[in-house]
């Protein structure tokens, strides 16, 4: 096998060009086995195998610097740069992350995981090279929907100013996570149809040279094209037409489903762990589709991640024009929602916590200053969410809860979530965000009659004395567990509070607690600095009330173990009880 002998790019160059397809097949075989056991980004990597081989065959990495956008398609790159064992040996599968990481290899230049950044990052590398009078090629790889992001277009716009070596590989697989949307992709389709000869050419209009490669999964054709642009003296785009999921029939047929996979059976392509349990995505989709049937002003908006809201292809078709995918463009999604709301519509925007940070300015400026009554639901905003350092979901509380006018809610159950949606989608007074709980969805069958328009009214779920435990969202269950343990171990009947509101204080209730409580505990699924608990502590600052804030430390974590992180932050019922008894 060729792959077993490759310890770096120099070994790729030793293989004859007509033998490189064998290497490509070996890479796919290894990726297939690994993905079937470990899961990971599937389609993007299968489509980039030949291009990755060609890049390392032609260029001199790491002197020539290759920057991958999102870097979810960097598995073949890692296999060719000294990390093959992480893809060949099951015991080493976790030796590498799912994205590029400079701590792993000198061939990786950035830790990235968000989209549309490679052109700007690589342009910075090229600018520094020029300032220092150095040489070498700088290559940005982008595609798989990433061109719909504003930063990608900003980067392309700037790239033409460089007037020096800068190579942009556009991996055009005619897909994002789902299908592509927007006029830009109509131009890419036209270029594919005309073999790159169409007069209307986005890249040329930006002042960039342009090369088209129709056979983007033909390693010989790619090597020829890359050799032509190597050592170029001005920015050039190499537009390659690839097939997402190439080499595995189920992935070629169902590209959206196979963008990312969990463990599966190789023969059938069926998941090994098929989750049939109801979750917040399916609940959201069902709710919105029903609402759309009765109200034509309701619109569901996504920024390239439709299934986060449960909108699979069939559901998107059912929603018709009341479902909008703006591409991977969170800023536009939020601004669009504001415009819809101002003109009398009822916009719903669903977004991962990790991605909402990309549109902080629009939430603040376009929505909250204008007091636009949008509904924005935050998914995976939890320590139980995605655990890659680039996709952490526990920074949204400090980020969103301190924006004026925004009402940020935290349900603990399905029923509370649906009640919040009922209120938010019909009210016209506030911008509303809802932070969904992490972990399995809890449904207790209760009927929630609370009027969420009466802002900042907490709910006392259990009346006690001496100690009050306020459990926000995900950690309301932890609050109940800690209270139960306190009763069992110390005979203390604690008050348990579900606050619902992240953005405001129930000052009347907090004041009342002073009468027969001396300790207040806050539990939140997010970082403590600037978070919910600090607001409670500040309220009690001049009093004798002891306040104990529990949440996460401000730090970047990567591929962490949830239980270990919870214990490290004393976020277990046993630790909370031990702490409070130690100061009582």
Regions found by a protein language model. Name each.
Residues 1-79, 215:
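N-terminal amphipathic, basic-rich helices that act as targeting or association modules
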Residues 29-36, 95-111, 133-139, 312-327, ...:
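Glycine/charged-rich beta-loop-alpha catalytic/anionic-binding loops adjacent to active sites
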Residues 39-48, 67-72, 101-120, 142-146, ...:
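Active-site nucleophile and cofactor-binding loops and adjacent substrate-binding regions
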Residues 41-162, 298, 303, 312-313, ...:
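Cofactor-binding active-site loop characterized by glycine-rich and histidine/acidic residues
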Residues 73, 108-264, 270-277, 282-284, ...:
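Glycine-rich ThDP/TPP pyrophosphate-binding loop and its adjacent helix/strand module
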Residues 86-96, 161-175, 368-380:
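A glycine-rich helix N-cap at a beta->alpha junction
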Residues 248-357, 362-372, 470-473:
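Non-catalytic terminal/interface segments that mediate subunit docking, oligomerization
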Residues 263, 269-274, 385-387, 398, ...:
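Peripheral docking tails and interdomain loops at the edges
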